[in-house]
């Protein structure tokens, strides 16, 4: 139950994409999200392409989805997009048991995370008026 979740309102020059229940810890996902925050989308895609982190492929796919949403749903110019926000949230934690010595067992927690990427269209600086 509880109260209804307040949706974040996007501005007219923004678009977003969300990846839910990604099988990685939020801390590890946040390391990759920090790589692309505030960068132009083409630069961010290049960084994700050559990143050695396992989860970089999922982040790249989510960023490409945000770019496609900006182009197709919001009619924004792809060449002037930046990654305005890339934030990570906790999701479920799967609990599993790991057999130990002497007939004992210990709990292993397998965390999941949510990723939200917001891209924003910025005006080119130095345009002649």
Swiss-Prot record:
Q: What protein is this chain from?
A: Large ribosomal subunit protein uL22
Q: Which GO terms describe its molecular function?
A: rRNA binding; structural constituent of ribosome
Record GO cellular component, one term: cytosolic large ribosomal subunit
Q: Which GO BP terms, alphabetically?
A: translation
What InterPro entries does the annotation carry?
Answer: Ribosomal_uL22, Ribosomal_uL22_bac/chlpt-type, Ribosomal_uL22_bac/org-type, Ribosomal_uL22_CS, Ribosomal_uL22_sf
Q: RNA-binding as a keyword?
A: yes
Query: Which gene specifies this protein's sequence?
Result: rplV
Keywords linked to the UniProt accession: Ribonucleoprotein, Ribosomal protein, RNA-binding, rRNA-binding
Q: How does it assemble?
A: Part of the 50S ribosomal subunit.
Describe the task this protein carries out: This protein binds specifically to 23S rRNA; its binding is stimulated by other ribosomal proteins, e.g. L4, L17, and L20. It is important during the early stages of 50S assembly. It makes multiple contacts with different domains of the 23S rRNA in the assembled 50S subunit and ribosome. The globular domain of the protein is located near the polypeptide exit tunnel on the outside of the subunit, while an extended beta-hairpin is found that lines the wall of the exit tunnel in the center of the 70S ribosome.
- Which family is this sequence assigned to? Belongs to the universal ribosomal protein uL22 family.
UniProt source species = Rhizobium meliloti (strain 1021)
């Amino acid at each position: 139950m509880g109260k209804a979740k307040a949706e974040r309102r996007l501005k007219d020059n923004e678009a977003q994409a969300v990846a839910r229940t990604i099988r990685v810890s939020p801390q590890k996902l946040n390391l990759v999200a920090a790589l692309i925050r505030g960068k132009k989308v083409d630069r961010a895609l290049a960084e994700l392409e050559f990143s050695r982190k396992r989860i970089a492929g999922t982040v790249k796919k989510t960023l490409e989805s945000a770019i496609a949403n900006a182009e197709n749903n919001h009619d924004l110019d792809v060449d002037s997009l930046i990654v305005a926000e890339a934030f990570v949230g906790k999701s479920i934690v799967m609990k599993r048991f790991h057999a130990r010595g002497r007939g004992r067992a210990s709990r292993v927690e397998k965390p999941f995370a949510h990723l939200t990427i917001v891209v924003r269209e910025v005006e080119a600086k130095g345009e002649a008026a």
